[in-house]
A protein has these predicted regions:
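Hydrophobic membrane-insertion alpha-helices, especially the h-region
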Residues: 6-23
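Alpha-helical transmembrane signal-anchor/signal-peptide segments
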Residues: 26-41
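Membrane-embedded segments
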Residues: 57-139
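Secreted/periplasmic serine-hydrolase-like ester/acetyl group-modifying domain
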Residues: 121-228
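Substrate-gating cap/lid alpha-helix
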Residues: 233-263
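Conserved small/polar residues in nucleotide/adenosyl-binding loops
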Residues: 267-270
Length: 270
């Protein structure tokens, strides 16, 4: 009996050690995303008129509570750090599992970028916070392809991020923005850090066509919105870099009966 108890205790200690080592070694700045996902799913079902999805350009740049105070509609910011287009599409689909918004905002900073047949990174990793459903399985299949080792790394981060032992720093122990803070701000995560920025003239930006992989995801978003009678607004947040897809997004929006808003150039408001 003592041997059995000893074996069980050892197994428990090893299991707990692996779990917490994996937590310590997970990529920096992903804990916020886990809290953001938990916060969103703690909200009452069907309680928001407007939901925004996208990268840090939205979750750090769109104060939805101020929108509510000014205009009276309920809104939630379901953006997270980094986010290539297929990650944003996953969050969009996940949002509709519990909410029935009238308007969806999709931020388009990374509209040309899609994770396909790639190794695990921090962005893909934090989607672990989203529970299993068809859209998530499709997302992981697109990200990982047929490589089973990538799935193993996804579920056991100790295997994927063991090299982080040499990069453990303050942020490895940081608890991030709390679930309660996200709940109070309805997903918005602002900052009091101000950096003077010069916005370039958009008329000088090279314009490119959208990749086929991006168009397929945009079509998916449009079709889901049409089926659910949701008004769809794509928008691009002004920033100091060069954005090459404002013309393509304006054309796409016009062709698909939705809206594209580019605050830098109001000629792209359709």
């Amino acid at each position: 009996m003592k041997k059995i108890v000893c074996c069980i205790s050892c197994a428990a200690i090893i299991g707990i050690s692996v779990f917490y080592a994996g937590r310590l070694l997970q990529p920096n700045f992903t804990v916020d995303a886990f809290h953001a996902i938990e916060s969103f799913h703690s909200m009452p079902e069907n309680s928001f008129d407007v939901i925004a999805c996208g990268s840090s350009h939205v979750y750090k740049g769109l104060n939805v509570n101020e929108m509510t105070e000014r205009y009276g509609f309920s809104a939630y910011n379901y953006g997270c750090n980094w986010q290539f287009l297929n990650t944003t599409t996953l969050f969009f689909e996940d949002a509709l599992r519990t909410q029935s918004p009238k308007v969806i905002l999709i931020e388009t900073f990374n509209v040309d970028k899609v994770h396909e047949d790639t190794d695990l990174n921090g962005e893909i990793y934090y989607t672990k916070g989203i529970s299993d459903f068809k859209g998530k399985r499709e997302y992981l299949a697109q990200c990982f392809g047929k490589n089973k080792d990538r799935y193993l790394s996804y579920y056991i981060p100790l295997l994927a991020f063991h090299e982080n032992w040499t990069n453990v720093n303050y942020y490895s122990f940081d608890s991030g923005t709390s679930v309660e803070e996200y709940q109070a701000a309805h997903g918005f995560s602002g900052s009091d850090h101000i950096v003077p920025t010069v916005i370039s003239n958009p008329a000088t930006f090279e314009q490119k066509e959208l990749p086929d992989s991006s168009v397929r995801l945009l079509d998916k978003i449009v079709n889901i919105c049409n089926k659910n009678n949701i008004r769809l607004i794509f928008y691009t947040v002004p920033y100091e870099g060069e954005y090459n897809y404002s013309d393509a997004m304006a054309e796409y929006a016009a062709a698909n009966n939705c809206t594209y808003l580019n605050p830098v150039s109001y000629t792209h408001l359709t």
